[in-house]
Every structure is written in structure tokens, then in C-alpha cells.
A protein has these predicted regions:
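AMP-binding/adenylate-forming catalytic core of the ANL superfamily
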Residues: 1-69, 78-79, 84-88, 92-96
Length: 97
């Protein structure tokens, strides 16, 4: 799984690992959403275990990854859609994005 934004390759797992460093993030998944100028933009779906804001997560991302890789949109959800084996259904997340 790879997001191509403005000609740059962005690996969702790299962003997910940064977001999971925050103690108030229970789980997350990152996808690419179509963007008219850049091809795709990064969207993060986050399940909170405590109070955390998009601004806090954005600041965390800016500390650990390049600016162009950070999510442009944070969606807070109660749970991530998963199949019977516990794998996140990114196709469902793309529909929600």
C-alpha cells in the first residue's frame, strides 16, 4: 500500500507508526484520498483511547516525519472496519474519506 502525492511516495505504515506513539491513540489506519492537484492526499482514521485533537497529532507528525507526509485530514472513529481475521478494511475507509 502506497500513497503517491505530488510525485512523492508515502508509505501509510510509516505515518501509522508515528500516530501510534501518542498514548491517546488506540489504533489508526492511513489511506490516500484523491486530490485534484496532488493526485492523492493523506487521511488518517484514528480510534481514540483518550482526549487527543487533530492539532496534537499534526504536531507529533511534524516532529517525526517530513511535512509533506503528514495527514491533511484526521477522522476520529469509534472503531476501524475489519474483516473476520482482524485486518483493517482500507477499501471501506476510502469510501468514508
Amino acid at each position: 500500500d502506497m500513497i503517491i502525492s505530488g510525485g512523492s511516495n508515502i508509505y501509510p505504515r510509516e505515518i501509522e507508526e508515528v500516530l501510534l506513539k501518542h498514548p491517546a491513540v488506540a489504533e489508526c489506519s492511513v489511506i490516500g484520498r484523491a486530490h485534484p492537484e496532488w493526485g492523492e492526499e493523506v487521511v488518517a482514521f484514528v480510534v481514540r483511547r483518550g482526549g487527543v485533537t487533530a492539532q496534537e497529532l499534526d504536531a507529533l507528525c511534524l516532529e517525526h516525519i517530513a511535512r509533506f507526509k503528514r495527514p491533511r485530514d484526521y477522522r476520529f472513529v469509534d472503531a476501524l472496519p475489519k474483516n473476520n481475521y482482524g485486518k483493517v478494511l482500507k477499501t471501506e475507509l476510502r469510501r468514508l474519506a
